[in-house]
């Protein structure tokens, strides 16, 4: 049965159509926000997937180019693999939804959000996020929703709810907040050094709007929701836990996990698991879930140690940061490099500088984002965690971590006018034991400074964790979580920023939300830790950006030419400019306004290219002197090339002070000669003279 529901959201109408399309999906909602249209669907497999110990949720955000009236590029003119923006949006949708599914649910669930029309005033991410929640809530898939999502901007000191694409370009804050009925469940932000108090206020502005949306969703679910289907739980039998405790008492498990060395801990757990496998060799049912049982036993042990005893697995205090180290210039010949180590997490970041023409082109649905000059790429090889696995390129996690570090650093980068380079940083994970994304922010900051990029301020990142008890007041916030505390804890709250404010936030949780008290404490903790990392480690390693780029980095010079001369510089089919590039070894970019960028490593080549371009772009006058090459000899004279593709003729009578019968008696092909411009001949060609060049020239 088709029903339509509407509400006013941030001055625009949000309309949800139920039962109109995609009726064979478990749940579907056709979302309209202004003229933006997104189809959100939720489907689940009939049976659980065998042999897995995780919930198989897949979230897709599909950008259709017809939504903005474009035909996709490429040979086959079809949408290809998901763009980076689509992947990041999928992750933002996934993170608040995942904790609300049953932890022991093993049926495959797929959420698909298809962007069908884009109104620049209404960001399609909003209806996609809300549509996923609505489609799942009205379906028969087990789900403890709803959740709602709102975006907040900050323009001229005023908060803007669900800013348009144009407003986002002006905003000092791009914040996305998801909430359940009472608590915040997901935060994602990029900011221009927004103070902590302002950030908290913005988070709860969004949370208040989310409560209105949840009441709207409740009405839809009450009228259209299906009864949730029953499923076979894969929970570990309590009898198995009791049997394990008899073989491995709690004190032994505590001793196994209580070490500051990740590999020692993993070896301890392997030994315990092997003993249990031998003990339960005759019980196939228990063996099938033994891995999950040991995991749960570890988890309960670690959480009890932290929550009741305030004892962390590596012996640190609750607010203590792991040992830190920082170095720069560790890799030769790259344009900049730095390594940042935090405990058993180690990141090395390399910086590469290139002309602005190397900026990444973006062909997406956002008409305001067509390119970006700063790119941060994050790599996580299997050896960083002591595993062997083939490398298959960056996955969604790597793309997400790279984007987080990129977002954290963009606010402190110099403008293209101040520093006319495209910039790429690559963070290589050498070792991982938690918080590699935040370590990559620290390493990237120092690498940029070592490369001579004049960033305004250094940026550091830190992550806080959480362990909760039975009540909202029973919790412990942990500063600088390691891998084990992330796996067994309830939160990964990443915050990056400068001394003066926040530049990026990403919060993931595994429970049904955080109270305001926890959010405020986590943000306060990360500020204290960030100050320590910046002051005591990073700024002691490199205090300020170097005042020059690395000797191996390209240099860039700019000149301005008359826009009407661009065609002369480029030449027919690029012949002239390509000849300059080939001859001098530089890279040349010219804008429609006549701004010319010359980029190269060799200063002599850059000077030559600059001289050639200026020569070509000059209006020639009689009396100008050039140095050129004899490129052609005729009976009546010689042709001299004074710039790539530009020639003038020296008549035989203008070659020498005395009479000559043959040009070849004086000149040969390839001779370098100085000529003086005599004007233009009857055919409009440049007329040169060799004999009239002053001796002092």
Regions found by a protein language model. Give the residues of each.
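Extended amphipathic alpha-helical scaffolds
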Residues: 1-45, 53, 229-369, 554-568, ...
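Flexible, glycine/charged-enriched surface loops at secondary-structure junctions
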Residues: 103-109, 144-146, 213-231, 263, ...
């Amino acid at each position: 049965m088709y029903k339509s529901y509407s509400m006013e959201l941030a001055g625009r109408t949000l309309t949800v159509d139920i039962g109109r399309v995609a009726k064979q999906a478990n749940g579907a909602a056709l979302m309209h926000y202004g003229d933006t249209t997104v189809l959100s669907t939720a489907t689940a497999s009939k049976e659980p997937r065998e042999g897995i110990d995780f919930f198989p949720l897949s979230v897709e955000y599909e950008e259709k180019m017809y939504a903005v009236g474009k035909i996709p590029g490429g040979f086959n003119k079809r949408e290809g693999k998901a763009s980076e923006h689509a992947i990041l949006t999928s992750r933002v949708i996934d993170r608040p939804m995942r904790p609300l599914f049953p932890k022991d649910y093993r049926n495959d669930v797929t959420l698909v959000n298809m962007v069908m029309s884009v109104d620049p005033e209404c960001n399609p991410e909003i209806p996609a996020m809300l549509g996923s929640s609505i489609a799942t809530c009205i379906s028969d898939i087990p789900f403890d929703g709803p959740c709602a999502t709102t975006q907040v901007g900050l323009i001229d000191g005023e908060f803007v709810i669900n800013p348009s694409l144009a407003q986002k370009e002006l905003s000092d804050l791009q914040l996305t907040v998801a909430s359940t009925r009472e608590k915040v469940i997901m935060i994602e932000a990029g900011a221009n050094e927004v103070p902590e108090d302002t950030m908290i206020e913005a988070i709860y502005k969004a949370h208040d709007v989310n409560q209105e949306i949840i009441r709207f969703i409740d009405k839809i679910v009450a009228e259209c929701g299906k009864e949730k289907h029953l499923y076979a739980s894969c929970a570990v039998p309590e009898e198995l836990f009791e049997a394990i405790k008899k073989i491995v008492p709690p004190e032994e498990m505590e001793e196994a996990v209580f070490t500051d060395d990740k590999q020692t801990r993993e070896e301890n757990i392997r030994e315990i698991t092997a003993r249990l496998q031998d003990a339960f060799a005759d019980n196939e049912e228990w063996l099938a879930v033994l891995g999950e049982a040991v995991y749960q036993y570890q988890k309960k042990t670690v959480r009890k140690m932290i929550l009741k005893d305030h004892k962390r697995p590596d012996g640190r205090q609750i607010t203590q940061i792991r040992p830190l180290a920082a170095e720069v210039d560790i890799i030769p010949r790259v344009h900049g490099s730095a390594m940042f180590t935090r405990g058993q997490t180690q990141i090395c970041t390399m910086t590469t500088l290139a002309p602005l023409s190397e900026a990444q082109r973006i062909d997406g649905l956002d008409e305001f984002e067509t390119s970006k000059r700063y790119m941060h790429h994050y790599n996580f090889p299997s050896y960083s965690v002591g595993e062997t696995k083939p490398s298959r390129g960056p996955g969604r996690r790597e793309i997400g971590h790279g984007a987080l570090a990129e977002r954290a650093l963009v606010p402190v980068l110099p403008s293209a006018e101040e520093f006319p380079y495209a910039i790429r940083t690559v963070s290589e994970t050498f070792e991982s034991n938690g918080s590699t994304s935040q370590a990559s922010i620290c390493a990237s900051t120092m690498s940029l400074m070592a490369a001579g990029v004049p960033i305004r301020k250094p940026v550091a990142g830190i992550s806080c964790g959480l362990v909760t008890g039975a009540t909202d007041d029973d919790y412990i916030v942990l500063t600088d979580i390691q891998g084990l505390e992330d796996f067994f804890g309830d939160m990964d709250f990443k915050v990056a920023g400068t001394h003066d404010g926040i530049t990026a936030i990403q919060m993931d949780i595994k429970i049904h939300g955080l109270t305001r008290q926890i959010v405020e404490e986590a943000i306060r903790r990360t500020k204290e830790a960030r100050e320590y990392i910046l002051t005591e480690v990073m700024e002691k390693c490199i205090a300020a950006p170097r005042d020059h780029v690395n000797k191996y980095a390209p240099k860039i010079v700019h000149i301005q030419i008359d826009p009407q001369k661009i065609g002369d510089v480029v030449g027919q089919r690029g012949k002239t400019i390509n000849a300059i590039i080939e001859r001098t070894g530089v890279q040349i970019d010219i804008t429609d306004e006549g701004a010319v960028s010359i980029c190269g490593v060799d200063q002599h080549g850059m000077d030559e290219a600059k001289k050639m371009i200026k020569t070509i772009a000059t209006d020639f006058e009689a009396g100008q002197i050039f140095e050129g090459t004899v490129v052609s000899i005729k009976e009546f004279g010689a042709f001299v090339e004074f710039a790539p593709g530009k020639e003038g003729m020296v008549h035989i009578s203008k070659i020498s002070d005395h009479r000559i019968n043959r040009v070849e008696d004086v000149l040969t092909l390839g001779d370098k000669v100085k000529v003086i411009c005599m004007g233009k001949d009857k055919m409009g060609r440049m007329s040169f003279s060799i004999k009239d060049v002053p001796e002092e020239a």
